[in-house]
Amino acid sequence: MEKRRVIYILVAKTEQQELFYLTGQHDKQELQDIRNHQQFFCPSCEAPLLLKIGEINIPHFAHRTLSDCDHYSEPESSLHLQGKLLLHQFFQQRNFKVELENYLPEIRQRADLLIDGQHAIEFQCSTISPEHLQQRSQGYQRVNIQDTWIKGLKEPCNEGIGLLRLKSHEIAMQQKAGSLSFILLFFPPHNRFYYHSNLLFISSNRWVGKTKSIPAAKQAFPFAVPKPLSKAEFKTVMDIFKNEKKRYIRNQLYAGNRIRNVYCRLCYELRMDVANLPELIGIPVPGAQHFKEPVVLWQLQAVAAHEKKIPLRDLIRSGKLTLSAGAQEREAAAVLHYYLSCYSSFEGNALNDSSLLDIVYHNYCKTL
């Protein structure tokens, strides 16, 4: 049997059918007095609510019994409550009309925050399936509301260029600004926004990207957009990819049974040293996340098809490459074409780290 959720909320309906918000305008003594003289009800399911005023947790409403109320995107936590209150304050201070936990009956969804009636902010602290996230986004689209997803953080991030392990729902939260994608995050204890930007896929849940933060006091709305990587920053990206390439090769060589190993078979087929691949194999390529295969492997498959003059769409349809969920064949073919144009331009040329950086960074800049 599925367990029902304990739902904590910040908005309730009074006996007079008015909405009462817990946004910090009342101190605890005032709330205790209000609780003694007022009854509260869930704006969605009309069930009675308790006003809870603890010494540690943020004041909030909760259903008197375990609830089947299904209009909330996630069960509340103190982090989620704190984050929503700080975001509410953020928009109020910038003179936006902001509604907390606004219920949209046309789509049976409740936005954590609704800005000027046309922009929903979802502050997501718990895991959500990419499919559910997409369903909620499509719901907002049906009523002409733009949605922005912000990932809640339990601890601050390390800043700079580095290796990131991203879950599928975090990837689904990506926002686009032109050709640049990024994930927006928020750490309530420090009232600080973080960005994971310039994300480049390596394999599985491993990405390379730039993490940078900005205090809420300096944030704008529409939210600030990260900048592309400088050449010096991209060199760090290249160094990480180089180390990840070595790690991948080492794992393949230790895997045993090289005859069945796809990586080893491709190397033999292409007459490449299994322990020392050409520099242009395993490089960062925008859009690599369209393939489930690690960067080294799909690039080897692309080179093998190129040498055999196999059309890219035939390679994709052959089953040798597996598209990620939601990836389109046309997009995947464009990534392969982009990579092979880079590879074939410098195939057979001796490349040092500096010239390789020039090539890959130049191609990265062309995608912006």
Which residue ranges define each predicted feature?
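Long, charge-rich alpha-helical interaction segments
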Residues: 224, 229-244
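A short acidic/basic microdomain associated with nuclease active sites
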Residues: 88-107, 116, 124
